[in-house]
């Protein structure tokens, strides 16, 4: 018997990989049901994704979709257009001609000196300024990465973001080649629902609404929880690792899907990122009905607000409509009121790890884990649903070898 603690994406994926290896599996989850943050809500206006809206399509995700018999829905051609807001309008390339020339010159000089890779303890802000100049950091690197990591560039470790020290025990990973973005035809929730159904059909035992308690060294275990929960569980068995995990700062995001009446002037594309210097409070906006088909008859937009590791306030449920309207006015010049809002997720704790130097320390100390114990989660050096699936498979392989 192998025990998996956590029934979010990482825990369910680890359980699946264990059953593929012939193991008997039990899953313990503190929440009332599976899925963690991932959920698709179907409303009268269209689908609302509570967390990630799609998978990077590569060999890993293609295999998962095939194994679970899920039909992939590819992103629309319009989603290839991505924008960064500068000087009052969205731009495909936010740097001026002079700034672009400066970026090319600096990057070329760094390449000649073989100095493109991040230095030890170098932040994203320091690295991108060294390689491309201050405008590159301000208008390109910082907004692009705040849209992924929800943290400011001067808090992000360049080595942690760009792969750090590789996999466990310093091994180098080969990333599967990306071929765009896809989602299940029924939304991201379909992936969770199908995986949960198939696991139950395979005889996996689920216990919901249960705390896991202390880990039992006689039971091979995968901990697939948040970083704070994992630190507490791991502490008796790998104290140095648990200490590092517990020191990872966590940040919060609030995403609200708003439905609008379409107009001929609507921006066509994946979405827009907003540098902090623009005065727009949102980190970014996703144009859902431009990214995937069947996301609603009207215009569906998801506005994302983040605390940036405590640097910014988050809107309250009563403020979010006003925030969206003001930010949308800055983007479009219009003051349209949403036709409807998607449901709020109330009281969610900080869920995203800040990828600072501590993440690298965690990677270094993974070797402290006893053979019967493995970890899976978004604090281990890989973000994004496709990469979390890889981590879950590696965790399952580790305990299955025992």
Where in the sequence are the language-model features?
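Glycine-rich FAD pyrophosphate-binding loop
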Residues: 19-42
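Dinucleotide-binding Rossmann-like beta1-alpha1 core, especially the glycine-rich loop
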Residues: 44-118, 143
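Short loop/edge segments at beta-strand edges and connector loops
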Residues: 6, 76, 206-211, 377
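Conserved flavin/dinucleotide-binding core of flavoenzymes
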Residues: 94-95, 285-402
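Active-site/ligand-binding neighborhood in enzyme catalytic cores
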Residues: 89, 104-220, 224, 228
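Mid-domain catalytic core of redox enzymes
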Residues: 210-315, 331, 364-365
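Conserved Rossmann-like nucleotide-cofactor binding loop
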Residues: 10, 33, 228
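N-terminal Rossmann-like FAD-binding beta1-loop-alpha1 element of flavoenzymes
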Residues: 2-27
């Amino acid at each position: 018997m192998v025990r998996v603690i956590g029934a979010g994406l990482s825990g369910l994926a680890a359980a699946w990989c264990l059953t593929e290896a012939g193991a008997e599996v039990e899953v313990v989850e503190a929440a009332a049901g599976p899925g963690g943050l991932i959920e698709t809500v179907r409303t009268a206006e269209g689908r609302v994704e509570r967390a990630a809206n799609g998978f990077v399509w590569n060999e890993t995700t293609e295999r998962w979709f095939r194994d679970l018999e899920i039909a992939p829905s590819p992103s629309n051609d319009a989603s290839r257009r991505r924008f960064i807001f500068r000087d009052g309008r969205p731009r495909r390339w936010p740097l001026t001609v002079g700034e672009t020339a400066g970026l090319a010159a600096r990057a070329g000089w760094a390449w000649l000196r073989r100095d493109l890779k991040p230095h030890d303890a170098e932040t994203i802000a320091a690295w991108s300024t060294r390689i491309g100049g201050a405008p590159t950091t301000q208008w390109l690197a910082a907004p692009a990465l705040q849209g992924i990591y929800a943290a400011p560039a001067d808090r992000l470790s360049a080595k942690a973001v760009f792969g750090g020290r590789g996999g466990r025990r310093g091994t180098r990973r080969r990333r599967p080649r990306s071929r765009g973005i896809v989602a299940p035809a029924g939304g991201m929730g379909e992936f969770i629902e199908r995986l949960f159904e198939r696991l139950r059909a395979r005889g996996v035992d689920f216990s919901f609404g249960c705390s896991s308690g202390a880990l039992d060294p006689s039971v091979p275990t995968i901990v697939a929880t948040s970083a704070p929960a994992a630190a507490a569980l791991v502490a008796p068995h790998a104290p140095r690792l648990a200490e590092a995990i517990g020191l990872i700062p966590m940040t919060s995001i609030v995403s609200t899907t708003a439905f609008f009446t379409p107009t001929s002037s609507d921006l066509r594309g994946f979405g827009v990122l907003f540098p902090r210097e623009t005065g727009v409070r949102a980190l970014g906006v996703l144009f859902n009905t431009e990214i995937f088909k069947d996301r609603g008859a009207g215009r569906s937009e998801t506005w994302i607000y983040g605390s940036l590791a405590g640097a910014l306030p988050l809107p309250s449920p009563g403020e979010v409509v006003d925030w969206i309207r003001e930010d949308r006015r800055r983007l479009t010049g219009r003051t349209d009121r949403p036709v409807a809002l998607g449901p709020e997720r109330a009281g969610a704790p900080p869920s995203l790890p800040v990828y600072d130097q501590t993440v690298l320390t965690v990677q270094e100390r993974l070797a402290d884990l006893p053979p019967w114990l493995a970890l899976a989660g978004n604090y281990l050096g890989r973000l994004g649903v496709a990469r979390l699936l890889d981590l879950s498979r590696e965790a399952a392989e580790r305990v299955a070898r025992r």
